[in-house]
From Swiss-Prot:
3'-phosphoadenylyl sulfate binds at residues 65-70, 140, 148, 203, 237-242, 259-261. The gene is SULT6B1. Keywords: Cytoplasm, Transferase. It is an enzyme of class 2 (transferase). Belongs to the sulfotransferase 1 family. It comes from the Eukaryota. It comes from Homo sapiens (Human). This is Sulfotransferase 6B1. It is found in: Cytoplasm, Cytosol. Its EC number is 2.8.2.n2.
Length: 303
């Protein structure tokens, strides 16, 4: 994944900040969306428009806990397969995280650059669209996303935790969590999924057929690999393989980033009332939309 020293150094700093941060003081709001004070700053957001994207940048957009670390690994392995050079992250890969000087430093980084983000489409720097960078948009069903988000907060040492699943569910539905409401993110991206430089990826599809998903990603990025190469990357990118190496690649948070990776884990926590509330929210926000169909909500969130 990321260059160990740089990635883990950033995570360690964020965890250190979290130690003395109460949950009620974890967020600051920028342009109507809450962000964690341990990872983002208003100064960085103000500098974000100075970021100069390149046509060969690879942008990975997702709501938190939807598989961005998984896709980061896959794309890194694809780059290695075609270039024979191990991809290294000179900066923490999430575009909006870090200090406000990072965008100047990134000008000197070699291409292609992999850029992760949890931002809405209309919050991204305009140069990404002007220079026609490739954008992979990763989605996961909202129920499993919520459960994974809770476990990340409550399992990782030093990160402020929630008193109960019920408490977290209320905050998740209100958007009082890092990067705001899942459904706001979804509505915003729904309008842009059919763009020429945009590729939609469903977490559940990757779980069902990882090799096929990797092949689609490779073709979208213009990487032409043999079946043997695709299979090799697939074996290296299973949840089990990534979890086994997570301490080395992600430091202290590694085992918590790769906790279960199961489809349907929400059934262990959701009450009937919570199910109904989420189902109604889905209908209100995404029923009849392109993204609503792509999420296969009936298959993964009902029954």
């Amino acid at each position: 994944m990321a260059d160990k020293s740089k990635f883990i150094e950033y995570i360690d700093e964020a965890l250190e900040k979290s130690k003395e941060t109460a949950l009620s003081h974890l967020f600051f709001t920028y342009q109507g969306i809450p962000y964690p004070i341990t990872m983002c700053t208003s100064e960085t957001f103000q500098a974000l428009d100075t970021f100069e994207a390149r046509h060969d940048d690879i942008v990975l957009a997702s709501y938190p806990k939807c598989g961005s670390n998984w896709i980061l690994h896959i794309v890194s392995e694809l780059i290695y397969a075609v270039s024979k050079k191990k991809y290294k992250y000179p900066e923490f890969p999430v575009l909006e995280c870090g200090d406000s000087e990072k965008y100047q430093r990134m000008k000197g980084f070699p291409s292609p650059r992999i850029l992760a983000t949890h931002l809405h489409y209309d919050k991204l720097p305009g140069s990404i669209f002007e220079n026609k960078a490739k954008i992979l948009v990763i989605f996961r069903n909202p129920k499993d996303t919520a459960v994974s988000f809770l476990h990340f907060h409550n399992d990782v040492p030093d990160i402020p935790s929630y008193g109960s699943w019920d408490e977290f569910f209320r905050q998740f539905m209100k958007g009082q969590v890092s990067w705001g409401r899942y459904f706001d993110f979804a509505i915003n991206w729904n309008k842009h999924l059919d763009g020429d430089n945009v590729k939609f990826i469903l977490y559940e599809d990757l779980k069902e057929n990882l090799a096929a998903g990797i092949k689609q990603i490779a073709e979208f990025l213009g990487f032409f690999l043999t079946g043997e190469q695709i299979q090799t990357i697939s074996v290296q990118s299973t949840f089990q393989a990534m979890r086994a190496k997570s301490q080395d690649t992600h430091g202290a948070v590694g085992p918590f980033l790769f906790r279960k990776g199961e489809v349907g884990d929400w059934k262990n926590l959701f009450s009937e009332i919570q199910n109904q509330e989420m189902d109604e929210k889905f209908k209100e926000c995404l029923a009849g939309t392109s993204l609503g169909a792509k999420l296969k909500y009936e298959s993964y969130c009902q029954g």
